[in-house]
Amino acid sequence: MLDSRLRGTRFVAHPTRSVLNSPAQTGMDFWSLNPYVGCEFGCTYCYARFAHRYAVERAHDQGRLTDEEFAEYRGAEGWEAFESRIFVKDELLAILDKDLRKVPLTETIVIGTATDPYQPAERIFRITRGVLERLSKCEGLSVGIITKSPLVARDADVLTRLAEKNDVEIYVSLITTDDYVIRALEARSPVPGARLRGLKRLTDAGLRAGLIVAPVLPGITDDYDHLRALFGAAREAGARFIHASPLRLYPGVRDRFLPVLTEHYPELSERYRTAYARASHAPRAYAQALTRRIQRLQREFGFQVNNGMRDRYLTRSRLVQLDLKVPEVSPA
């Protein structure tokens, strides 16, 4: 065990032989890097939650977890381990140089596709900052960072150096400016105001940063009032772009998300349960209608239409996200 925190979070060393996942491995059009496994923010809808069991099993098999710890992590509510048992790739920086030799210049590396690289663990271990410092010695790369945390602004200095010879974009993840929604569905994550202040610090430093609104939640955050407030806040924070896509709800995530949804939005419970009973995605008609709504707001607030996470970054994952099944919710 590496360390623990007052909220009950424990940190476990996570040895690894490779830290960069290639496009062939991920099925996406970029290389990915995740400094941690699991995420203390613990968003109820997070698609990475279901994979945490594999890290737990591996740690047990390698003797890094006792039988008692393994039983605790894989218990009846084993999904809690995702946000309270964080696996730390503490040897990542020693391996990164070797892995970088495999990445052709002009290709893209996205940091934080299956964890938040600026979750509270980063204040202790500073692995993400170390990655950026190493990447700042490169030239010709495209680097994307996805985070919900204002801690990213701590690294404005190294991000500025990185951007001198590389293409850098920071995607601040925020689904709404409504504190109630955030506390209901992202109870351990930073409040909207803190994220927006972090975004402003980045844009004030001259960095290319904006919002990623993912997921848009049918019947909760997809109405004009929610979206207009969010777009306006992004504009005030100097966002250079805003990208949005609807919810995808995989089977391994439903057991965590649906009870919370029922508690806070009982009127939507049956609709979601029916919609996601057999599939993780919603009808194309909903996705297309939502896209039109987003494009209208992009024009209204002066953002480039369809800008945000570039097509070459997330082509396949965007297609997945834009195909979610939530009938009876139809933005116009």
Feature locations, PLM:
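Auxiliary Fe-S-binding modules of radical SAM enzymes
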Residues: 1-15, 21-26, 219-332
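Conserved Radical SAM active-site core
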Residues: 2-36, 40-171, 175-183, 192, ...
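Amphipathic alpha-helical segments that form well-ordered structural scaffolds
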Residues: 95, 134, 201, 289, ...
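Conserved strand-turn element in the central/C-terminal portion of the radical SAM core barrel
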Residues: 145, 177-181, 186-188, 201-223, ...
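Surface-exposed amphipathic alpha-helices with a cationic face
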Residues: 160-164, 199-204, 295, 299
